[in-house]
Amino acid sequence: MEEEVAALVIDNGSGMCKAGFAGDDAPRAVFPSIVGRPRHHGIMIGMGQKDSYVGDEAQSKRGVLSLRYPIEHGVVTNWDDMEKIWHHTFYNELRVAPEEHPVLLTEAPINPKSNREKMTQIVFETFNAPAFYVSIQAVLSLYASGRTTGIVLDSGDGVTHTVPIYEGFALTHAISRIDIAGRDLTDYLMKILAERGYSFTTTAEREIVRDIKEKLCYVAFDFEQELQTAAQSSTLEKSYELPDGQVITIGNERFRAPEALFNPAVLGHESGGIHETTFNSIIKCDVDVRKDLYGNIVMSGGTTMYPGIADRMQKELTALAPSSMKIKIIAPPERKYSVWIGGSILASLSTFQQMWVSKQEYDESGPSIVHRKCF
């Protein structure tokens, strides 16, 4: 029994769910973390209308559904919908029986204790998994980069965290969270495109703007300088073809949208930018570990995929840090999925196999076992 069964690794993000088998180098399934329910109940009898749709199917039928994201800012807020997403992951995406595989799930840093317990309970009681483990997302990203010490800037669709990690343990007191991430940048891009006269309002149109953002946006090395360049010439302008064939032109919006990561004030947020947050997290750590953190700043998550973000981060942190400090930003090309990849590495290690919470341990101790075995 020991060897041949692969563990399942599921990284539940606010925007996308990444799932697959431990030992693989990429997730098998990547789909939107959404559950859709019909807005109008079936008029046509016998149309076989389901009472809920998950992921891509919900996305494609979004015109007639009301869509909900069960994960807000990285934390699960709707457990019934979350259960539907896991069910969909096991049975429709991976096509496995969860009672036959150990399951590794990921959680946001500073996830409430009750949430970990609820997660544990659902995996064992609803899905009857033989074994379970929950791991902090940022720690997995660090593993994926081949490190055990460093600070991870993890920015996805719903939340951004800076998480200092020493020898594999997250230094909880120094973790910072900013509620600015991909979704906010998409909204901001919608707003500034409207100023140019392009109106995007519906949830369907929001997906178009997300695509524009992913294909054309970048981070300016020097924001003021870039604004001047954009004003004086058309070198920075790019065109984008909408689904209906209309072509729109986008100029300084390309770098104005992601600039919000470094200057959240444009979104009306009080928090500091990602560079200040990273710096503040490092400052909260012991003097002796700071050098190791400055030298291992690892980016992870889809919102760190903008061209130019690493160079800009290097520049901003150099200005904040002590002058003698060596600063190194690591931005691996696969960072969009590095949380999942780290989980795949961890769950397939031979030394990890004794770390799983087994069904037997769960039956003896209840959900609180998760705090004793998963750190």
UniProtKB/Swiss-Prot annotation:
GO annotation, cellular component aspect: cytoplasm; cytoskeleton
Keywords: ATP-binding, Cytoplasm, Cytoskeleton, Hydrolase, Nucleotide-binding
Species lineage: Eukaryota, Fungi, Dikarya, Ascomycota, Pezizomycotina
A GO term, aspect molecular function: hydrolase activity
Organism: Thermomyces lanuginosus (Humicola lanuginosa)
Localization per Swiss-Prot or TrEMBL: Cytoplasm, Cytoskeleton
Family note: Belongs to the actin family.
Statement: the UniProt record of this protein carries the keyword Cytoplasm: yes
Catalytic activity line of the entry: ATP + H2O = ADP + phosphate + H(+)
EC number(s) recorded for this UniProt protein: 3.6.4.-
Enzyme class (EC, first level): hydrolase
Annotated function: Actins are highly conserved proteins that are involved in various types of cell motility and are ubiquitously expressed in all eukaryotic cells.
One Pfam short name: Actin
Entry annotated with the keyword Ubl conjugation: no
Protein name as annotated: Actin
InterPro entries: Actin (IPR004000), Actin/actin-like_CS (IPR020902), Actin_CS (IPR004001), ATPase_NBD (IPR043129)
Superkingdom of origin organism: Eukaryota
